[in-house]
Swiss-Prot record:
Residue segments, region Disordered: 117-149, 215-239, 262-285, 309-409
Originating species: Acidithiobacillus ferrooxidans (Thiobacillus ferrooxidans)
Keywords associated with the record: Plasmid
One Pfam family in the UniProt entry: TraI_middle
Protein name: Protein MobA
């Protein structure tokens, strides 16, 4: 594949990499994997091209890495997949794979296969509530905390849309811990100290549209902005307040320590620079008339010594920064934290909050009795038995399922 790729001397990178991921619990057979690759490559128009793929099971979701060589093996021409819009073609391929193999559709899939076998664009519901950008939703999933963008959408946008004057807009936003400020040619809606692009909250919240409706922008007049507390994305999550308090304390301490370290290191760099300059100045104050060769030799010696001093200081600072990173490791996400608190059931509830988790229901309850289940390590916890997948050395990993007597979650 590499040799063929190098034949395309005018194209630097002719190998595209894609990742196809199945939902947790979905187990494609080898035949289905082969079929999925064929459908995917056919939809992208590269069915005759070279490809390498492999199925990985190192995460909770089985996923397939697929590398496709865009150089045609016979014509040696470089194919521009879907005129450069290969991701759009990939969305179509996913819809066809889901339809052919019966997998659950992606929540935000762009396409679906119609009854006549043709692809149809998923209907966009204009009345559907606006959602934060994907990175913000990812952070919400990790921490359980509403992002500033979501708060701007849910709390800020309604206030902005109903405001009749700039004074009313600033006053009502301030009561909710927000402020609307002109920034450059646009505007930013601040939720606490976190800025959100105003148009991300609502199309009608942009500066241009508000100025058409309310007149020229008027800044707030000494407005007292209320203090906002962190808000959970889902109400009544057990332990969430303790989790988010610990998380914020962790990063507050980390940032404070980093500021002290940066200030100290900057002072050390400045001090070394001053010392080295003083030494060079002292050298030049001597009488070097007629001793040019000696002066140049001394300059070389001092330059080498000072370069070594700078390198030593740089290495020292790098070690300090690494110690800082080790001391303040990333705080666990909410699910990990719940498992660390010996609450696997709560962790599973959070993990599957958007769907009904798989479970087995019986017709009677039994006392907690460890069962010999291959590859799993049982542990009695109260009136339950927690089963963890065995790792190397016989140790148990994270809890996989819980036997509650009458039901298994």
């Amino acid at each position: 594949m590499i040799a063929l790729s190098q034949e395309a001397v005018r194209s630097k990178d002719t190998i595209n990499h894609y990742v196809l991921s199945w939902r947790e619990g979905e187990q494609p057979s080898p035949e289905q994997v082969e079929e999925a690759v064929s459908i995917f490559m056919d939809e992208l128009g590269v069915k005759d091209h070279q490809a390498i793929y492999g199925l990985h099971a190192d995460t909770d979701n089985l996923h397939l890495h697929l590398a496709i060589n865009r150089v045609h093996p016979e014509t040696l021409k470089v194919v521009k997949i879907n005129n450069g819009f290969d991701i759009e073609a990939a969305h179509k391929a996913i819809a066809r794979i889901e339809n052919a193999q019966g997998w659950q559709r992606e929540q935000n899939g762009r396409y679906q296969v119609l009854e006549n076998g043709e692809l149809g664009r998923e209907h966009i519901d204009k009345d559907k509530p606006r959602q934060p950008a994907q990175p913000k939703r990812d952070m919400e999933n990790r921490t359980g905390e509403k992002s500033a963008e979501r708060i701007a959408i849910e709390d800020g946008a309604p206030i902005i849309k109903k405001a009749q004057t700039w004074e009313q807009l600033h006053r009502e936003l301030a009561a909710k811990g927000m402020r609307y400020e002109k920034t450059g040619s646009g505007a930013t809606l601040f939720v606490g100290d976190v800025g959100v692009k105003a148009s991300s909250a609502d199309r009608d919240a942009s500066l241009s549209k508000l100025q058409k409706r309310l007149g020229a922008y008027q800044p707030p007049q000494r407005q007292q902005v209320a203090q906002r507390e962190p808000e959970p994305i889902k109400p009544d999550v057990p332990g969430w307040k303790d989790y988010i308090t610990g998380r914020k304390a962790h990063y507050s301490e980390k940032n404070a320590d980093k500021l002290v370290q940066d200030k100290r290191q900057e002072q050390e760099r400045k001090q070394l620079a001053e010392q080295q300059k003083a030494r060079r100045d002292e050298l030049m104050r001597g009488n070097w008339k007629g001793k040019g060769e000696v002066l140049n030799a001394m300059r070389s010696v001092i330059a080498a010594e000072q370069a070594a001093e700078k390198a030593a200081l740089k290495e020292k600072h790098q070690k300090q920064r690494e110690q800082h990173r080790q001391q303040f490791r990333p705080y666990p996400d909410l699910e990990q934290w719940q498992r660390m608190q010996k609450s696997p059931e709560l962790a599973e509830q959070w993990r599957h909050r958007a769907s009904e988790p798989q479970r087995i229901e019986g017709d009677r309850s039994e006392p907690p009795t460890p069962r010999d289940i291959r590859a799993y390590q049982p542990e009695i916890v109260g009136q339950q038995v927690h089963y963890s997948r065995k790792e190397e050395g016989g140790r148990g990993g994270g809890v996989s399922f819980v036997d509650k007597g009458k039901s298994i979650d």
